[in-house]
Amino acid sequence: MILLQNLSGPLGWAVLGISLLVIFGLIVMLISWYKKVPQGKAIIRTGVGGTKVAIENGIIVVPGIQMYEVMDLSVRTIEISRMKEDGLICKDNIRADTKVVFFVRINKEVADIKKVAQSIGCQRASDTATLRELFEAKFSEAIKTVGKRFDFVELYDSREKFNSEIQNAIGLNLNGYILEDASIDYLEQTDISYLKENNILDAEGIKKITELTAQQKVK
């Protein structure tokens, strides 16, 4: 009873005021420490408490003992071209000029985001130049391997199958990234002027083109 009487006096109001001020200060502090995740991105927090990933909501970052970086999870494109002298060699040794666009992004799973952050870094993870370094050779090899399964005319008439088999050849193991889609942007026969007669494969291709052209003239 005495305590309640004391709190009802000037001292009580002072204690209440200080308490409210402290609570208000804590709320303001927590709000300033709260980092909301931008759309299409993730926040990776390091420091005390270990590595934490926020994808949809937000996360508290305490200055001085914790740090954070933002990682872009949006889709990036990588275009692989095989043109002219480097045209894709088909099963019948006819070359094809082709451009394939790959749509790649970081997988929206905590384990994959951590893997990419630790191995590549948040800032470089979605940089187009970095993605080319990581995947250009793999994607180019997939195009080359799959293209060799088709004769040129079959390849030209079966773009969807060509596309599907390229994606299957690349697979799902992209070390934290995923191949979301691919698109055959351009596909035409390589001009015969770029083929080399002293190249065995090109010589076979020239022979095949000559035969097909002759057949078309007869028709």
Question: Predicted regions span which residues?
Answer:
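Elongated, amphipathic alpha-helices that form coiled-coils and helical stalk/scaffold elements used
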Residues: 79-219
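Single-pass alpha-helical transmembrane signal-anchor segments
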Residues: 11-31
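Short, strongly hydrophobic alpha-helical membrane anchors
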Residues: 1-10
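Solvent-exposed beta-hairpin/edge-strand motifs
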Residues: 59-69
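Aromatic-capped interface at the extracytoplasmic side
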Residues: 27-41
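Transmembrane alpha-helical segments that serve as helix-helix packing and pore/cofactor-lining elements
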Residues: 33-35, 73, 88-89
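Edge strands and adjacent loops of beta-rich recognition modules
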Residues: 68-82
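Membrane-cytosol interface motif
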Residues: 39-61
